[in-house]
Amino acid sequence: EFSLTSYTFENIVRHVLGETSPHYSLDRIASWLENGSAVMRIRGLRYIVYRAKASIRILDRTGVITRAAELAKVIGIDFNAVLTRGSQFRVESLMARIAHPEQFILPSPSREQVAQQRAAECLPLVLEPQSSYYTDPVVVLDFQSLYPSVMIAYNYCYSTCLGSLEDIAAGPEAAGTHDHSRHRLGVSSLDLPPGLLNALKEHITVSPNGVAFVKPSVRRGLLGRMLQELLESRIVIRDAMKRWGSDNAVLCKKLDAWQLGLKLIANVTYGYAGASFSGRMPCVDIADAIVQSGRETLESAIRFIHSKHAQWGARVVYGDTDSMFVHLSGQSRESAFRIGQEIAEAITRMNPAPIKLKFEKVYQPCVLLSKKRYAGWMFTSPEQTEPLLDAKGLELVRRDGCLVTQRVLEGTMDVLFRTNDLSLVKSYVTGEITRIMRGELSLQEFIIAKEVRLGTYSGRVLPAHAK
């Protein structure tokens, strides 16, 4: 909901309601009510009533109850389960309703079966960024819902998987059985009738990691059906929000809760298949197929962009799972928007539906430091004149540092992007350090807030926040 450095009642009230709330300890309130004068008892009661009313206002402002109720309706689970159960329960609830009419039963593997399946072998592509300060435009392109789209496009599902070609060739020894028609698949084994692969050889898709799946012409996967319905429903809901949301705030909140719930379910479906430690129904063959297909999709897009260097002058300087940062040397910001759209449309045409590359934004200028650490002035449309500072992974947006670090870094970025003059950056930072040394800043700016996980730290010396 809100990314805060501290989740005390007073801090939440300040950020959500824009009010300043006094802080009284429970001991003090108890002493007012039990031993205090009439005035102090009234003060204690007023504070308790204020906290109760403020809590209700926070719930209303954040829409927690509305979202949970609408999500329960969409998924088909009870209200309490939305708040207390995890994402696997939600995926399974939807999948069970789709599987039942098809007369499929969802297996329930034991912890031993989950632990005995082979380890995952495939990793998403995360390129080492070409760390630099870029004054020319950097276009950010993102594959929209990459893993759900891959599962739909290639029909990856429990109900369509024939297993790894390597395991099929290895025979019963790999599956731990003496039945020569069975081979290993995820946490269990699969019985393939003799001659089935031969009969289906024209109707099989082999994933990049060597796992065979039947095409939709033979059987449409349950996961693909579920995801396609989720994504299509979300598009319809978002269109309805644009059409009627501005005239009806209550309806807009309800529709937004629906589309957010559908998005969350679609995004965690891969995790349901890949949860190899605590999963309810993991299948490493399917999970690896999804990851490796996504990796090859991104690699293919990068190769295509580099092959068109003469046309666009584009070079991929960073890539992470489903997104690319494309540097356009010598191009204007207006040209960057045009070229970015051309790249997105060309790569979308290369891939089967519904895999789609989406043009996200343009950074100019931009600093790439390392993996998942960058910042830049963001433009989302050619008409935008005032940039927005966008950052990821830096102390500027992290919640485990102090306010003075965030403020100074934000000011540093502003001076650098506005002037491109390192001497002015140095002057600004020197001035801030001088103010710190003179004690001109509030002590609140130096408070470090970091999550404490007692029992997880090694060594004799605990970190400062755990003492």
Protein language model features and the residues they cover:
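Short beta-strand
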Residues: 315-320, 359
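Common nucleic-acid-contacting/processivity interface regions adjacent to the catalytic cores
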Residues: 33-155, 162-165, 171, 178, ...
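Active-site-proximal helix-loop-helix substrate-binding element of RNase H-like nuclease domains
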Residues: 1-53, 176
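C-terminal polymerase-core module
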Residues: 325-467
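Short, surface-exposed acidic
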Residues: 19-29, 160-163, 315-317, 354
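Catalytic cores of large soluble enzymes that bind and process phosphate-bearing ligands
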Residues: 1-5, 40-51, 87, 138-139, ...
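Catalytic nucleotidyl-transfer cores of nucleotide-processing enzymes
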Residues: 1-4, 112-275, 372-395
